[in-house]
């Protein structure tokens, strides 16, 4: 079975639950007292998707303003980006649009974008309507899902949908399946003055 490494970065404001989503996906656990990410953290998880193994190389970025300049370093070369907002905080959804704009300007052109409305278990204090977020995601051709890292809602489904959207290696083989050979340049005879 073929193994594909897929770099995925999580972007979004501080406190939206990026680290909790990663922990739920990788470790199937939830820590309500998780510390804010400083810079970025890295975790991996391998899952089977159809006839391939997908090894997700997950970069969980810090959401604080002082770390925003580092974000391009993490999404450069990514197969996918998950932009997370908190359904109970309207401002995190507004800021999400800035993350999308930055990603479109500086990220890989073929990056798969997913929007995750986290904390969907807190519907009684919801500020972002699911329909509004879904409409926005559709307008930018992004995956949309509401998640709850706390209650393990739609976390695995999010990564399955990312696997589904990433073009298969069979569908688009590099160079039409043809490679090229490197050849050594013939060396010229050395000249000497004596």
UniProtKB/Swiss-Prot annotation:
Keywords tagged on the record: Cell membrane, Cell projection, Cytoplasmic vesicle, Endocytosis, Endosome, GTP-binding, Lipoprotein, Membrane, Nucleotide-binding, Prenylation, Protein transport, Transport
Paired cysteines (S-S): none
Top-level taxon of the source organism: Eukaryota
SUPFAM superfamilies: P-loop containing nucleoside triphosphate hydrolases
This protein's record includes keyword Lipoprotein: yes
Region: Disordered, residue numbers: 170-194
PROSITE patterns: RAB
Subcellular location: Endosome membrane; Cell membrane; Early endosome; Late endosome
GO molecular function terms listed in the Swiss-Prot or TrEMBL record: GDP binding; GTP binding; GTPase activity
One GO term (biological process): regulation of vesicle size
Binding site for GTP: 12-20, 60-64, 118-121, 148-150
Biased composition (Basic and acidic residues): 185-194
Gene Ontology CC terms: actin cytoskeleton; early endosome; endosome membrane; Golgi apparatus; late endosome; phagocytic vesicle; phagocytic vesicle membrane; plasma membrane
Tissues of expression: Detected in brain and heart, and at lower levels in lung and spleen.
Gene3D superfamilies recorded: P-loop containing nucleotide triphosphate hydrolases
CDD domains: Rab5_related
Pfam families (alphabetical): Ras
Lipid-linked residues (S-geranylgeranyl cysteine): 193-194
Major localization class: membrane
Membrane topology recorded in Swiss-Prot or TrEMBL: Lipid-anchor
Motif (Effector region): 34-42
Function: Plays a role in endocytosis and intracellular protein transport. Mediates trafficking of TF from early endosomes to recycling endosomes. Required for NGF-mediated endocytosis of NTRK1, and subsequent neurite outgrowth. Binds GTP and GDP and has low GTPase activity. Alternates between a GTP-bound active form and a GDP-bound inactive form.
Complex formation: Binds EEA1. Interacts (in its GTP-bound form) with RINL. Interacts directly with ZFYVE20. Interacts (in its GTP-bound form) with RABGEF1.
NCBIfam families the record matches: small_GTP (TIGR00231)
Recorded family membership: Belongs to the small GTPase superfamily. Rab family.
Name of the molecule in the record: Ras-related protein Rab-22A
Organism: Mus musculus (Mouse)
Gene name linked to the record: Rab22a
């Amino acid at each position: 079975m073929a193994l594909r490494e897929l770099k995925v970065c999580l972007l979004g404001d501080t406190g939206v639950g990026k680290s909790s989503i990663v922990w739920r996906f990788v470790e199937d656990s939830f820590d309500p007292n998780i510390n804010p990410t400083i810079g970025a953290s890295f975790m991996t998880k391998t899952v089977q998707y159809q006839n391939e193994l997908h090894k997700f190389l997950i970069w969980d970025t810090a959401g604080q303003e002082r770390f925003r300049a580092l974000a391009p370093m993490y999404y450069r070369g990514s197969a996918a980006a998950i932009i997370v907002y908190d359904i109970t905080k309207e401002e995190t959804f507004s800021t999400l649009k800035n993350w999308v704009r930055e990603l479109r300007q500086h990220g890989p052109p073929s990056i798969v974008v997913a929007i995750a409305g986290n904390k969907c278990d807190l519907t009684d204090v919801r500020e972002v309507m699911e329909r509004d977020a879904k409409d926005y995601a559709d307008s930018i051709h992004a995956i949309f899902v509401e998640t709850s890292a706390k209650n393990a809602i739609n976390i695995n489904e999010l990564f399955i949908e990312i696997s589904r959207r990433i073009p298969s290696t069979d569908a688009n083989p590099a160079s039409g399946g043809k490679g090229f050979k490197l050849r050594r340049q013939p060396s010229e005879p050395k000249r000497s003055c004596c």
